Amino acid sequence: MSYRELVVELAREHAEALSDALLELGALSVSVEDADADTPDEQPLFGEPGLVPDRTAWQHSRVIALLSPDHEPAVLLAAAVNDIGVTETPKFDVREVEEQDWVRLTQSQFEPIPIGERIWVVPSWHDAPDPDALILELDPGLAFGTGSHPTTRLCMEWLEQSVKPGQSVLDYGCGSGILAILARKCGANPVVGIDIDPQAVESARQNSERNHAEVTYGLPDACPAGEFDIVVANILSNPLKLMASMLASKVKPGGRIALSGVLARQADEVAAVYARYVDISVWREHEGWVCLAGTRRESH
């Protein structure tokens, strides 16, 4: 017997309460999305880190609850609506969810990714298409960075062209560790990866061990005091601007820095902030995202 999805559309002031009530009544999982997504009425909810959101739910929300076969959707919804004090049952729909081999289905969605001239990012369940290439074995996980996003790809292409053996590299906002691992495989040493998320740091350590790449990882307070030949930061434009002085100070005079997580329309603003410290410009653009790259001046 198949599982079912209960799909409910309602105003934002009731979305969170209904989600909690459905979970308390036995729903296996609940998610909330914008009911106006992919329409002219779609609303952005969360901005970049450092910016305060002006709302906590979409004006027109869609609550999706996954139910086991022994739950009757209409009965469960009526009970949840009653629990939160809503007098009228909102519009809803029920979808059948067939049982599948979810592991196999998920794996089928992730194929080896070629990047640059000789890099392949390969999930552990795949064989490397070219065993002589520079192989990074990486599975999709909780930490950002598998090579599929344009910003990750841009940074990897830049590192492939820029890193020389023996150079020191700092990957600030390392996520999965993909950039730090690549730098090490390109011959950089030492390589340091820093992230504010302890889970990302642990994920990066595991990925480095899997790839036999010696990288030192830690939280921001563990960042070494010295300067690096290369600093790379694939974050977002607002944090990059806030950290400009600190990140620039981690680059040796004459050393290089690469920044991504920046939309093409944000490039001039980010570059203007960093121009106080480095000679910087757009290195490459891909699918609306850019990688900014530059060199720290000998004195500033």
Curated annotation (Swiss-Prot):
Any GO BP annotation: methylation
Signal peptide positions on this chain: none
Pfam family membership, one: PrmA
Molecular function GO terms recorded: protein-lysine N-methyltransferase activity
EC number: 2.1.1.-
SUPFAM superfamilies associated with the record: S-adenosyl-L-methionine-dependent methyltransferases
Reactions accelerated catalytically: L-lysyl-[protein] + 3 S-adenosyl-L-methionine = N(6),N(6),N(6)-trimethyl-L-lysyl-[protein] + 3 S-adenosyl-L-homocysteine + 3 H(+)
Keyword Cytoplasm tagged: yes
Annotated InterPro entries: Ribosomal_L11_MeTrfase_PrmA, Ribosomal_PrmA_MeTrfase, SAM-dependent_MTases_sf
Compartments where found: Cytoplasm
Top EC group: transferase
Assigned GO CC terms: cytosol
Main subcellular location of this protein, as a coarse class: cytoplasm
KW S-adenosyl-L-methionine (keyword) present: yes
Residues binding S-adenosyl-L-methionine: 152, 173, 195, 234
Keywords in alphabetical order: Cytoplasm, Methyltransferase, S-adenosyl-L-methionine, Transferase
Function, as annotated: Methylates ribosomal protein L11.
Family note: Belongs to the methyltransferase superfamily. PrmA family.
UniProt-recorded name of the protein: Ribosomal protein L11 methyltransferase
